[in-house]
């Protein structure tokens, strides 16, 4: 990927966060999790801590509920978001 990598740094800047909205989010094995709806920003550090994912696959997330994915799970971002890790599935509703 030629876009943003996560490394030890967190994405910063309003322009970057705006461009995340609507990107497809993929699991490490290539399955589509859903779409980025928004980013959660820590107000003290102004850094992204989570991506809020909508339209999740019901086979991966019970009830297709929206999901907050920790930034540390993100491997890289370009035209899509690729996760480095995702818990065993499906994610239960409770």
Protein language model annotation of sequence segments:
Residues 1-94:
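Peripheral interaction segments used for macromolecular assembly
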């Amino acid at each position: 990927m030629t876009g943003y990598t996560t490394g030890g740094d967190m994405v910063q800047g309003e322009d970057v966060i705006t461009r995340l909205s609507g990107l497809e989010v993929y699991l490490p094995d290539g399955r589509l999790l859903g779409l980025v709806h928004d980013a959660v920003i820590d107000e003290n550090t102004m850094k992204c801590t989570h991506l809020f994912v909508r339209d999740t696959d019901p086979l991966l997330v019970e009830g297709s509920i929206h999901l907050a994915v920790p930034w540390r799970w993100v491997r890289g971002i370009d035209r899509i978001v690729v996760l480095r890790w995702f818990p065993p599935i499906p994610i239960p509703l409770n």
